[in-house]
Each structure stands twice: as C-alpha cells, then as structure tokens.
C-alpha cells in the first residue's frame, strides 16, 4: 500500500506523470509508452513494486479465497502461505519505503529531520484516515491501513539510525515482545481496549511488525541494485524461514511429548473449551476481586500461553517464531525479485503497475468485497480471487499508462508534501555525509 511505499517518492523515482523538461525548457508530457517505461526503469526499483503486488494478491486470497489448511500431501493447501505472510511482507516493504523517502542509502542530516518527520506524519495520518473510511464501510475483514498509518508515525524517532543499529533494535523486540505482550494480557485477565487491540493484541501487532519495519528500513539503506546484496538477502531469508519453521515444529513436538498435559493436543482442546465456557458465564459473574485473581490467572493456563507466544506458527499469532519465519519469507521474496525483476521487467509490467499503486488496489478490492458480499459479509470462492486479481492487474496497468500515479497515492503524496511544506526550512548545514556502507 502506499504505506508500503506506493508513490514515486517511495521508490526513488521522479514519478511517472511528466517527462523531464524538454531542451527548450518547456515540460513535455509523457505518453502511455513513456509512463510504462518509467515504471520499470531506474531509478525506480521495480522489484519492490512486484513484491507489493504479490502481497496484495496474497491479501486478496486471504480475504476471499477458499484455501484448505496446510497439508504437505495436498498441493492446493500450499496456497495457505498467503495467510499472515502477505501482511508481514507489507511490513518489510513499508520499512524499505520509509528508508527510501528519507534518503535511501544516505542517513538524513539533523537539519532535514523536521520536514522529513512532518512529511511522514502527514502520510501516516492520510493512510490512517483512509483506513477508517474502509472500516466504516463494513468490509468484514481486518483492514490493515489504520495500523499502517500508526506504523509510519511510530517510525519517526528512528529514521537516522544506521542499518546495524536498526537490526540491533529489531532483535530484542522480536525475541521478547511477544512474550511480554502475552504476559501483560494474562496479568490483566485478557482485558480489552481499542488502543491495545489496535497495536498490541489485534490481527496486526506492533511487537510483530516493529522488528520487520526496522528490518525493512535497514534493507532500504543498502545498495539493493547490486546482485550480490540481493542474493544474500534471498539466502538469509530462505535460511531464516526454514529454520524458524523447523524449530517451531520440533519444539511443539518436543513439548507435547515432555508435557502433554500442557502442550499436547488434549491440553489445547481443553484450553479452547475453557475459553468458550468462560465467555458464556462472564455475563452473570460479578467482579472477581483480588481474592479470585490468582485462581482466574491459573485458569488461563500461563504455561501454554507463554509457550505459544514463542513457538506458534499460526498466522497472526504474533509469536517469536512467526516473526522470524514470515520475515524470512519476506526477505526471500524481495531478494529473489531483486535478482529477476529487472531482466523480466516487461513480462512483470502488470505486477509493477499494481505494486506502484497498492493503496488504490487494496482499497478497490475492499470496496468490491462490500459490493459483492454486502456490509459485514464474506466470500470464500477462488473464482472471485482470480477475477479480482485479473481485474486489478488490467485496471492498474491501464491507469499507469494513461495517468501514472494511482489516485489514492496522489492523496497521500499531497498530504506528505503539504505537511512537509508547513515546517520552515532549516538553515543549510555542513555537506551531507557519504552513503551508508
């Protein structure tokens, strides 16, 4: 989405609407062919556009697809990879985009920070408001844009950190964040609040996304046009995904053997039944008070919950291993596309077009979902998935050829520009430092 770097600034291009000034000094307007050529040519990183498009297509599948649970012997179930991993791919892409709009490989100077932060703030608010509108339409899905807007704002303090420091900050959040959130949920006996649901306990959790945003920002400071860098990104991502998946499966089997009363399938079933029973009875129970607090805490099965916060591979569980697995998949996808997207740029043009306007494509998908399924309704039909994908690919390619930047991407770019212009320009400082190495 635009939050994943939708407009031309986010990918480092000069946009696709207007050609450079002609030799005579008059600006020459681009035709369809020139717009499409600019879409897949440097300085735009078309691999990132393709990655965004794949994330959108995966999100559409998660919303409307009829996908069976994963079974190694059932090829159709491999499509279940879209659940959870599509949104995590967006998280890494959002971090890359934040790095690109704040200097690419060059760390921004202190004098640049006020305008850069104001611009990110304006973009984040615009994305948040668009997400609110979509939520109020009753789409029946967990709209990602409100959380995306928060992510852009949360990145303001760290835009001057070097890649090594971004990674050092991401690691403890990924390792400890899920456990701390689960612990706080248990200590509060699962209390609910809209703010906590937005950033900590909902489908999109800050403790899951923050490490991936920081990872993406570190990637965005790297020379992504170098094949060696792309190959290392793909290799590291593949290794992380395989190791996290293997570790999750092995630990689940080991704990189920060593402590079946806590981690075995019967214990999981009993925990689910207890949740249902508690939900059915809580309306008639008065406040428990401190006398019943310990008993209520024990009934939540802390050992099970804390273990799941580390080893669960369930989509949107927010566990430590889910972060490493989904982050690894995202790196593998991005690294692989950095290697092949440029040579295959014309073949991948429709995906590049969709990925250049992901906020628009995502929003159109949600509006179409409301039209087809009614407010609050849902669909599980792979034909709808295919039709939605093809329709968006054609529409986005046509719009890119005729108009360039997507309509909602124009809105967020305008908001970012106006917010940045509202901050007085700082006095010129010393010469900029060299690019990050």
Label the predicted regions.
Residues 2-10, 15-437:
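Alpha-helical transmembrane segments and their immediate juxtamembrane cytosolic regions
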């Amino acid at each position: 989405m635009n939050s994943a770097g939708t407009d031309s600034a986010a990918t480092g291009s000069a946009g696709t609407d207007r050609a450079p000034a002609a030799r005579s000094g008059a600006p020459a307007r681009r035709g369809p062919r020139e717009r499409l050529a600019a879409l897949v040519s440097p300085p735009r990183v078309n691999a990132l556009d393709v990655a965004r498009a794949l994330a959108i297509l995966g999100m559409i599948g998660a919303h409307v697809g009829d996908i069976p649970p994963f079974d190694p012997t059932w090829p159709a179930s491999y499509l279940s990879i879209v659940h959870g991993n599509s949104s995590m791919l967006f998280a890494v892409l959002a971090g890359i985009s934040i790095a690109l709009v704040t200097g690419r490989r060059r760390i921004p100077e202190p004098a640049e920070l006020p305008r850069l932060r104001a611009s990110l703030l304006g973009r984040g608010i615009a994305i948040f408001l668009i997400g609110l509108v979509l939520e109020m339409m009753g789409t029946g899905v967990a709209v990602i844009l409100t959380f995306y807007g928060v992510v852009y704002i949360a990145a303001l303090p760290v835009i001057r950190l070097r890649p090594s420091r971004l990674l050092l900050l991401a690691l403890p959040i990924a390792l400890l964040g899920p456990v701390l959130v689960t612990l706080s949920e248990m200590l509060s006996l699962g209390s609910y609040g809209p703010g906590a649901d937005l950033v900590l306990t909902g489908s999109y959790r800050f403790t899951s996304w923050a490490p991936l945003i920081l990872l993406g920002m570190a990637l965005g400071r790297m020379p992504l046009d170098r094949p060696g860098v792309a190959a290392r990104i793909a290799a590291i991502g593949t290794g992380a995904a395989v190791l996290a998946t293997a570790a999750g499966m092995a630990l689940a089997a080991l704990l189920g053997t060593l402590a079946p009363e806590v981690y075995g399938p019967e214990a999981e079933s009993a925990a689910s039944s207890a949740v249902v029973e508690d939900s059915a009875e809580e309306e008639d129970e008065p406040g428990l008070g401190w006398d019943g607090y310990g008993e209520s805490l024990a009934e939540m099965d802390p050992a099970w919950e804390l273990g799941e916060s580390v080893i669960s591979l369930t989509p949107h569980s927010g566990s430590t291993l889910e972060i490493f697995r989904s982050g690894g998949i995202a790196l593998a996808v991005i690294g692989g596309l950095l290697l092949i997207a440029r040579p295959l740029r014309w073949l991948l043009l429709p995906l590049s077009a969709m990925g250049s306007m992901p906020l628009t494509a995502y929003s159109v998908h949600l509006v179409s979902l409301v039209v087809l399924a009614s407010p609050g309704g849902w669909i599980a039909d792979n034909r709808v998935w295919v039709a939605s994908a093809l329709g968006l690919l054609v529409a986005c390619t046509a719009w890119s050829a005729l108009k360039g930047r997507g309509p909602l991407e124009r809105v967020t770019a305008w908001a970012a520009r106006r917010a940045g212009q509202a901050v007085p320009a700082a006095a010129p400082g010393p010469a900029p430092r060299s690019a990050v190495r």
